[in-house]
């Protein structure tokens, strides 16, 4: 199952300029998802990060993974209409710069859910090359 940007916006509350998932290619609700962020020079962040050498901030790559995790978990009927809140980031490793023109492939696996909290393991790649990986803790409110 894949999701368009319109379907993504029905699931998570994020909107421009903070919506960082453009398309979901695969989803197993409550378990895992694969999606994409198309990185373009038109994004506001590149006006200052950095002029003349635009680089996507690592925290936004983590946020994109967290949003994809939100899509995966909020796709379950029992969480419809809720909001995913970032609780913690562990073992984040940044391996490659991401620049305008790159397509960031996002993959998240929900490894634990207990009550309103859970943990996802995410990885983002560009052309098969690892850009970032992290363990993300979230709350559902």
UniProtKB/Swiss-Prot annotation:
It is an enzyme of class 4 (lyase). Pfam families: FabA. GO terms for biological process: fatty acid biosynthetic process; lipid A biosynthetic process. The keyword Lyase applies. It catalyses: a (3R)-hydroxyacyl-[ACP] = a (2E)-enoyl-[ACP] + H2O. One of its GO terms (molecular function) is (3R)-hydroxyacyl-[acyl-carrier-protein] dehydratase activity. InterPro entries: FabA_FabZ, FabZ, HotDog_dom_sf. Keywords: Cytoplasm, Lipid A biosynthesis, Lipid biosynthesis, Lipid metabolism, Lyase. Belongs to the thioester dehydratase family. FabZ subfamily. Involved in unsaturated fatty acids biosynthesis. Catalyzes the dehydration of short chain beta-hydroxyacyl-ACPs and long chain saturated and unsaturated beta-hydroxyacyl-ACPs. NCBIfam families: fabZ, PRK00006.1. This is 3-hydroxyacyl-[acyl-carrier-protein] dehydratase FabZ. It comes from Clostridium acetobutylicum (strain ATCC 824 / DSM 792 / JCM 1419 / IAM 19013 / LMG 5710 / NBRC 13948 / NRRL B-527 / VKM B-1787 / 2291 / W).
């Amino acid at each position: 199952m894949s999701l368009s940007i319109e379907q993504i916006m029905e699931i998570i509350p994020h909107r421009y300029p903070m919506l960082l998932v453009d398309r979901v290619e695969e989803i197993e609700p409550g378990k895992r998802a694969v999606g994409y962020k198309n990185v373009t020079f038109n994004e506001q962040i590149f006006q200052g990060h950095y002029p003349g050498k635009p680089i996507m901030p690592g925290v936004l790559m983590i946020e994109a993974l967290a949003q994809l995790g939100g899509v995966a978990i909020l796709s379950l009927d029992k969480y419809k209409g809720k909001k995913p809140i970032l609780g913690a980031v562990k073992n984040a490793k940044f391996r490659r710069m991401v620049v305008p023109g790159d397509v960031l492939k996002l993959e998240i696996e929900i490894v634990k859910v207990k009550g309103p909290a859970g943990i996802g393991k995410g990885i983002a790649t560009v052309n098969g090359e690892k850009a970032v990986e992290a363990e993300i803790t979230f709350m559902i409110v």
